[in-house]
Amino acid sequence: MRISLKTALLLGTLFGVNALSMDVAQAAQHKKAKPAVHKKHIRKVSINHVEQWQATRQLAVESGAALVIEQGGGGDTLFQKNADLVVPIASITKLMTAMVVLDGAPNLQAPITISDEDVDLLRGSRSRLQVGSVLPRHTALLLALMSSENRAAHALARHYPGGMEAFVSAMNIKAQSLGMRDTHFEDPTGLTSNNVSTAHDLAKMVLAAHHYPLIREFTTTSDASVEVKGRTLDYRNTNQLVKSSTWDIGLSKTGYIHEAGKCLVMQARLADKPVIIVLLDSAGKLTRIGDANRIKRWIENTSTTRKLMTRA
């Protein structure tokens, strides 16, 4: 008998809690039994079910909005919290930026020049790409996705046929084509809080972006060295989990502005199943990482319980 992961999440909790209740009742019935028999009964049955209940108890995350879905099949929802709340998404935006760039089938070796127009005057975010820097479109895309380089992302959009206005229009058209009905973009970087979406919509965007091999590669690259204006610049991935040996991540993107909080979206294999994770509006430096690890443990524990139930 095959049991889906979603079904296991529901049945596992009920099974564990009901079994625990039965153990309590059985213990009461055997209250007058001999001490040796009573001790043996509790050791053999009750402890196993307590452990199973602990493994399948309800997941709790600290992020303001969250969604976990199975990738492929029916796309079952495994967990959700405020998943339809429309919120700013910060640099998660850059996944859409990358898709629009690649949809245009550009020459990835063509040079991209950083200009004064690419400097962030809204928030004053830092960048090591000085005005006048020239780098291949391929490298600009890598930096935009891996290290969330705002000047690189803005320059990519500015070099789009028709310029910035045409690029942002293409972003919104792409969003609508993916069924992202509660999503709106006004810039390619995510620095504006007017770039908004929901966890449900972003799951659709992650699913779409996962079809692009270059996006998968660049978002999961842990670090890179880039030659710019005679200097070697070292960049790191903004998601520390891509370097973890305990994670199998196929796509990743982080984001942060004050209005959006800390954000993280990922495609990953957990318990040998591909899933999409969306975490929005996280407070604190490590909250989104902590939530991701809690989700990972929860799914892995649930999968173990499911296997036990299937064998039974």
Regions found by a protein language model. Give the residues of each.
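N-terminal secretory targeting signals
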Residues: 1-65, 297, 301-312
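Short, hinge-like loop/turn segments at secondary-structure boundaries
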Residues: 27, 130-131, 236, 295
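Domain-terminus/edge residues, biased toward the C-terminal soluble/receptor-binding domains
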Residues: 180-184, 193-312
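Active-site-adjacent loops and short helices of periplasmic peptidoglycan-processing enzymes
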Residues: 30-32, 38-200, 204-213, 270
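Hydrophobic alpha-helical segments, especially transmembrane helices
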Residues: 3, 7, 95, 268-270, ...
